[in-house]
Amino acid sequence: MHYVTPDLCDAYPELVQVVEPMFSNFGGRDSFGGEIVTIKCFEDNSLVKEQVDKDGKGKVLVVDGGGSLRRALLGDMLAEKAAKNGWEGIVVYGCIRDVDVIAQTDLGVQALASHPLKTDKRGIGDLNVAVTFGGVTFRPGEFVYADNNGIIVSPQALKMPE
């Protein structure tokens, strides 16, 4: 489905929260949305690797990487695996890499920046906890929508207005 965040904001002003404008769109899908699954980690993408292996149909992985600009939490192999397993998109409060390949992948990806260095895999992080960045709290089971205009969060699923 194609989402337009300004239209969703206009149709549901009482429901949406808008994330501060700090993200760039890197994925092959220019818009995406779905149920939130969260990861909180810092320069360790072990849980990202685990989650993209699972069925992600109708879901968006929201990764709170602490805003680190020193390591990439997502690369082409994990993005391709996420697309294969039906994930709608991934939002990374941190960096990604392999951006040219990710731009060709059928997956929505928004992140702060790109960085060529991968993370360590120490198995450290938290799954499905509330995470806060960009002035908004992302809660598992709520919904996130993203496009080139920005990222919004809602406590319930939203439909594009007619």
Swiss-Prot record:
Keywords for this protein: Lyase, Metal-binding
Keyword presence, Metal-binding: yes
Catalytic activity field: 4-hydroxy-4-methyl-2-oxoglutarate = 2 pyruvate; oxaloacetate + H(+) = pyruvate + CO2
Name this protein carries in UniProt: Putative 4-hydroxy-4-methyl-2-oxoglutarate aldolase
Assembly, per entry: Homotrimer.
Cofactors (names): a divalent metal cation
Source superkingdom: Bacteria
Free-text remark on how the cofactor is bound: Divalent metal cation.
Binding site for substrate: G75, D76, M77, L78, R97
EC number of this enzyme: 4.1.3.17, 4.1.1.112
GO molecular function: 4-hydroxy-4-methyl-2-oxoglutarate aldolase activity; metal ion binding; oxaloacetate decarboxylase activity; ribonuclease inhibitor activity
Annotated family: Belongs to the class II aldolase/RraA-like family.
Species the sequence originates in: Pseudomonas aeruginosa (strain ATCC 15692 / DSM 22644 / CIP 104116 / JCM 14847 / LMG 12228 / 1C / PRS 101 / PAO1)
PANTHER family from the UniProt entry: 4-HYDROXY-4-METHYL-2-OXOGLUTARATE ALDOLASE 3-RELATED, REGULATOR OF RIBONUCLEASE ACTIVITY A
Function: Catalyzes the aldol cleavage of 4-hydroxy-4-methyl-2-oxoglutarate (HMG) into 2 molecules of pyruvate. Also contains a secondary oxaloacetate (OAA) decarboxylase activity due to the common pyruvate enolate transition state formed following C-C bond cleavage in the retro-aldol and decarboxylation reactions.
Chain sites annotated for binding a divalent metal cation: D98
Family matches, as SUPFAM superfamilies: RraA-like (SSF89562)
Any one GO BP annotation for this protein: regulation of RNA metabolic process
